[in-house]
Amino acid sequence: MCTASPCDLEEIPLDDEDSDSLEFKILEFYVKHHVFQNTSAILSPKHLRTRSLSQKGPERWPVSEAWTQGPWPCRHSQSSEKAINLTKKKSSWRTLFGVAEKEEDSQSSPPEICAQAQRSGVPQARPRSPKWPRSRSSMDQRLEHKAADPRVVSIANRVAEIVYSWPPPEEVHSQGGGFKSKGVLVFQGPQGQSGAESTKKEGEDQIIARIVELLKYSGEQLERELKKDKVLMTCFQDVLSYSVVKTITDQFLRGVDTRGESEVKAQSFKAALAIDVIAKLTTIDNHPMNRVLGFGTKYLKENFSPWIQQHGGWEKILRMPHEEVD
């Protein structure tokens, strides 16, 4: 079932302290410049990040040429972020953290994504159209009226470098040569009053599992898949809460294999991926963007900020050059 009680939809109040926090500002800038703006120019369908790192051994992670072909268009906006040229060397997330890696050429054919959810016994509810363009416009106005903090810009851009260095999927072909998408979400219809709670929990688990899988795609592909699957979009909006956002992010990060890496490198990479996951969830929410950003700020503060401060701050754990944050 896709219904939720009022307590499920209760929002976490966004205090001034939260909206002025470094975590919130990083998420806010990342959403605007690395999820919504110029996404199609950065990530083409040929290079979708559709799997967790655990599906390939650490020593065999390929280096994708798609992420080393020059400066990203989004880095040339009117704000103070610096253009980042990646043509000098190929890099994976490991080399971004200073780990030597043998370069490999990776070629893949454009995968055809078939992730339309199969529906069985679901009442035809009137789908609610996503309202993120309006929220994005609101954020545009906000950022236009205040200069972006150079420190926030540098950290968000560094996070994007790390996230985009995540290797693309190996080619997986069916007999017809198409791409096999993992997991098909099947929504269950009403099962009677006695099993209502169980059905609701199962339905929520299915929604979370499907969202986790879709978050492995680029922001552009995620948006396309959700536009095709109105039931998934509506059901996610109905169950959205901090606990759901936390569960989705936790499950996504558990699928990332960082075996053989130091704690600092592993946690740094997961922190970057957490920011990317939370930013992409703003695409799905039907409420003002601040709602998901509030959830994301709380998640980062609870799960990463204390550890980051203990290890010298964002700049140090992300291995940022000193000149980027002067």
Swiss-Prot record:
Motif (BH3): 211-225
Keyword tags: Apoptosis, Cytoplasm, Phosphoprotein
Coiled coil: none
Post-translational modification, as annotated: Phosphorylated by MELK, leading to inhibit its pro-apoptotic function.
Residues modified to Phosphoserine: 44
Localisation: Cytoplasm
UniProt motif BH2: location: 307-314
Main localisation: cytoplasm
InterPro entries, per database record: Bcl-2-like_sf, Bcl2-like
UniProt feature, compositional bias: Basic and acidic residues: 137-147
GO aspect biological process, one term: regulation of apoptotic process
Role played: Plays a role in apoptosis.
Record protein name field: Apoptosis facilitator Bcl-2-like protein 14
Organism of derivation: Bos taurus (Bovine)
Name of the gene encoding the protein in the UniProt record: BCL2L14
